[in-house]
Amino acid sequence: MISAGDQIIVDLYDTYGGRTFDVYDKEMEFNFVIGNYSIIGFIDRVDVYDDCVEIIDYKTGKREVAQKDVATNLQLGIYALAAATAFPNKKIKASLHYLRSGRIKSHEFSKADLENVKSPLVTRINNILKDSNFSPTKNERVCSFCDHAKSGACATGAARLKRMFK
C-alpha cells in the first residue's frame, strides 16, 4: 500500500503524463494594478498551449467549489486577470485541481468574465480596508514580504531602506 502523498503523485502523472504542453512556470509571481491597488501573488502552475494559457491552482483540502461557482471564484478570477496581463493575446483557462479526489474544475475566462472580476475585487479590498485596522506593523520579519516596506511607502519600510543604503 502506498501513502496518500505517493498516490497523489501517481494520480497527477495519470492525469498529465501523456499531454504535450509547456509548463511555463510553477509558483509564478504576479503583480498588476487595478484602480489604486497593486495585486500581488503567486499562481501554483501556469501551462502554455498554442492559443491558451491554463492556470492551475492545486487544492489539498477536502472542500470543493461547485463547478457552477468556478466562473465566479474570486481567487481564480484574480489569477485569470494576472494571466491576461502577462499573456494578452491568449485565451485564459483557470482550473482548480483537487489533489485528494483528482477532480479538476475549470473555466475559460472571456473578456467579459475578466471585466466582471474587477469590480468585486475592488469592492472587497475597499471593505477590508474600511473594516480593518491596517496600520503598519513594527515587525521587520513581516515587512520583508510587503511591497510598501520594500518601496519605503510606510514608516517601517522607510527606516529599513535608510539602514540598507547607509
Positions of the model-derived regions?
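RecB-family 4Fe-4S metal-dependent nuclease core
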Residues: 1-166
